[in-house]
Amino acid sequence: MKEYSFSSIDSDLAAKCHELNEKNVPNVGSRSLEGLTNSIENSDYNEAIVFQNNVIGFVVCFQDNENTIKYMHEIKHKNFNEIEHRVSNFLYIDRIAVDSHYRKSRLGTSLYENTLKFAKNNFIKYLTAEINLLPYVNQP
């Protein structure tokens, strides 16, 4: 059985998350290393899955609190700012990615479950996310 570790994303892991992020474009938006690192540092919840010293999955989320709202307005985050006008007490899943070699192993499910646990522990009522339907449609 494979031994995966789950941890918060530190500066060492941020570069590895960036590599994985760029491998997952266009399913997630492209970001510069500096931009992704800045997002991770300002996020309210983040987590990486590490296997054999490689990041094979990660999630970055933002809660609608005062500091995050200020940050999201500063970077002009279109989706978060739109959701903020419609819902309150939410956690926005900004990006989630799993390495293509490790899909169908329930790792994405684990990231979502851990995100949900964070939301419940912090009395957050809603989970929100942008869903990209194109260029791919998931096939069961």
Model-identified regions with their sequence ranges:
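A short beta-loop-alpha structural element at the N-terminal edge
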Residues: M1-C17
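Glycine-rich phosphate/pyrophosphate-binding loop shared by adenosine-nucleotide-utilizing enzymes
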Residues: K2, N53-F58, L91
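Alpha-helical elements of Rossmann-like donor-binding domains used by nucleotide-donor carbohydrate transfer enzymes
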Residues: K16-L20, G35, N54, S110, ...
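Active-site rim helix/loop that mediates acceptor-substrate recognition in acyltransferases
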Residues: P26-Q52, F58-E66
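Conserved acyl-donor/pantetheine-binding loop and adjacent beta-alpha core of acyl/acetyltransferases
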Residues: V60-R95
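Conserved acetyl-CoA-binding loop-helix of GNAT-fold acetyltransferases
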Residues: V98, K104-K117
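Conserved GNAT acetyl-CoA-binding A-motif
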Residues: A119-L134
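Short, flexible/disordered intra-domain loops and linkers
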Residues: L134-P140
